[in-house]
């Protein structure tokens, strides 16, 4: 069903201060361009180039990726149709690598898109920090820093499906984060599929209420230091640490099952583990696999699961616990089809904007 959604934006641009622009990105064949509507193979990059900090880029779903993009010293939001959209859309908002360059790229947010990698500080010519990054309701392969000269500050990755491809070091990894001042990885589903490199590499991370799944023989952590690992489920993948490269980590209330090494490292190299459980978490349907996540799988805990209300905070271990439990559909956004507004905007006068959108 299509609806016309009239929005009255009160005191729109009433001062000379910065104003937010919504830009529509549609690379589907035959898409029609217009004011703040970008089409063609480079639609997303063109929209980024035209944007200023604070702008929102709405990526229309399609079958062809919008390709790799670079955001240089702009604080932008990229929104897609949702993590696993319903209503028979059958397509996703697809993007390649997202490269963030420069400290003014702080405040970047991505929600509801399927992308390859987030590469913060991909071109780090001097010491800077990109901060306040939010990745939510997305599917992606990895978050990776290419340089230890720069840093990430206050990044949150939540309610995502992470398939752990395209590592730069010894194998495919989900996270390679060298220098940070606050990275929270919470309520995600994370694939483990390499026996020579864990999927998490970093220092000072907080890792809570995730599901790490695999095929029974692989481990999660490599060169992970001074991190908090709490309320996670390790299904057919090992949380055991290599104490030569992993030091000073605190594990609290995690559960492991079905791995070749169902153990938690405690009392070695400054690593500690308390409240851990070695038992089947009784997930409804998560098979033994190293393949990418399939959305027909079901992470719901069955009755009698030892992970129910067993987290340090009294909620479930794994993605169904914590403050914001995992929602496989993510936050579904309406599919914006057209935005109509006057060609001339008078300062200090209310502006009426008509948005035509299709429900999701």
Residue ranges and their predicted role:
Residues 28-31, 61-64, 81-85, 237-238, ...:
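Acidic glycine-/aspartate-rich tracts in secreted/extracellular proteins
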Residues 315-351, 358-360:
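Short, compositionally biased P/S/T/A/G/V-rich stretches that sit at domain boundaries
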Residues 26-65:
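Acidic Gly/Asp/Thr-rich repetitive segments characteristic of extracellular carbohydrate-active
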Residues 57-59, 76-81, 111-116, 133-138, ...:
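Well-ordered beta-strand segments characteristic of repetitive beta-sheet solenoids
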Residues 1-23:
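Bacterial Sec-dependent N-terminal signal peptides
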Residues 75-125, 143, 165-166:
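Right-handed parallel beta-helix/beta-spiral solenoid domain characteristic of secreted/periplasmic
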Residues 273-329:
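C-terminal accessory segments
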Residues 72, 121-127, 146-149, 155-295:
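Predominantly extracellular beta-rich ligand-binding scaffolds that present long acidic/polar faces
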């Amino acid at each position: 069903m299509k609806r016309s959604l009239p929005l009255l934006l009160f005191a729109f641009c009433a001062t000379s201060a910065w104003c937010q622009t919504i830009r529509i990105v549609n690379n589907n064949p035959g898409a029609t361009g217009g004011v703040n509507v970008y089409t063609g193979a480079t639609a997303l990059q063109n929209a980024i180039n035209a944007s200023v900090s604070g702008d929102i880029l709405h990526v229309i779903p399609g079958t062809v990726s919008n390709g790799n993009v670079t955001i240089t010293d702009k604080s932008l939001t990229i929104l897609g149709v949702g993590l696993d959209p319903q209503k028979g859309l059958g397509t996703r908002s697809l993007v390649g690598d997202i490269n963030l360059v420069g400290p003014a790229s702080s405040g970047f947010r991505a929600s509801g898109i399927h992308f390859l990698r987030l590469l913060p500080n991909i071109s780090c010519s001097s010491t800077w920090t990109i901060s306040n990054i939010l990745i939510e309701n997305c599917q992606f392969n990895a978050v990776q820093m290419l340089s230890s000269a720069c840093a990430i500050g206050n990044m949150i990755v939540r309610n995502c499906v992470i398939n752990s491809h395209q590592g730069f070091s010894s194998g495919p990894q989900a996270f390679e984060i060298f220098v940070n001042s606050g990275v929270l990885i919470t309520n995600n589903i994370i694939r483990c599929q390499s026996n020579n490199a864990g999927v998490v590499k970093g220092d000072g991370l907080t890792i809570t209420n995730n599901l790490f799944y695999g095929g029974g023989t692989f481990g999660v952590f490599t060169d992970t230091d001074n991190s908090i690992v709490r309320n996670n489920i390790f299904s057919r993948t090992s949380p055991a640490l290599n104490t030569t490269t992993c030091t000073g980590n605190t594990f609290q209330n995690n559960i492991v099952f079905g791995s070749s090494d169902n153990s938690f490292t405690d009392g070695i190299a400054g690593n500690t583990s308390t409240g851990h459980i070695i038992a089947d978490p009784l997930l409804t349907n998560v098979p033994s696999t190293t393949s990418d996540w399939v959305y027909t799988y079901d992470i719901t805990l069955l009755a009698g699961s030892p992970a129910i209300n067993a987290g340090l905070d009294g909620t479930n271990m794994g993605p169904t616990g914590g403050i914001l439990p995992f929602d496989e559909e993510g936050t579904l956004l309406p599919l914006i089809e057209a935005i109509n507004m006057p060609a001339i905007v008078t300062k200090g006068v209310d502006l009426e904007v008509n948005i035509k959108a299709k429900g999701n």
